Amino acid sequence: MERALIRQEISKACKRLALTQQVVTMCELEATPRQEEFLYQVLSQELAYRERLRRERLLKRAAFPVRKTLDDYEWTALRLPAALPAEDVTSCNFVRMKRNLILYGPVGTGKTHLAIALGVAACEAGLETRFFTAASLATKLDEARRSGNLEKLLQSIDRAELVILDEWGYLPLEKEQAQLLFQLISSCYERRSLIITTNLSLIHI
């Protein structure tokens, strides 16, 4: 790698690591090309290490019941609308564009697997994600409301760029729970992406 390019990469790495540009200045004044190459490798390894830690934190906060990947998903059961290319789904572009997915079909068609796999992919892409079953989230919201902690819970969810609601319609909800859940969904509109899995037909969602 050319020396000028190495210095550019060192400068970028310093910014990402929140280091001052004094490192770059010292390189330009005192370091040999070999020393600059070594420093570049050290900074690159530190960046990679921090990125791995960040992904693990995102995966932990997402609270997936299990971890699934897109590699072992059976794609033959999936039909996407023409307006949503598969690339936008697998690359998580739909999250960046704040678009929503409703995965519906009979039990055993891999809806939850795909939802979790997309959530894992989003975390690996650095996107804050939260996973809930619809019933568990409704219960959490209701309990938080009763205990006066609703705002705190909503703020936690508000940090997410992707919210996954699994098993929509699987269990009946109390009126207050349903209202809180619908309010949350409404607040997500054009602000973050939702993935909802359900075995209900669209007219019943």
For each feature predicted by the language model, list its residue ranges.
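Phosphate-binding P-loop
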Residues: S91-K98
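Short glycine-rich substrate-engagement loop in P-loop NTPases that contacts/grips substrate
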Residues: A82-L84, R130-I157
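N-terminal pre-Walker A segment at the start of P-loop NTPase domains
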Residues: D71-V89
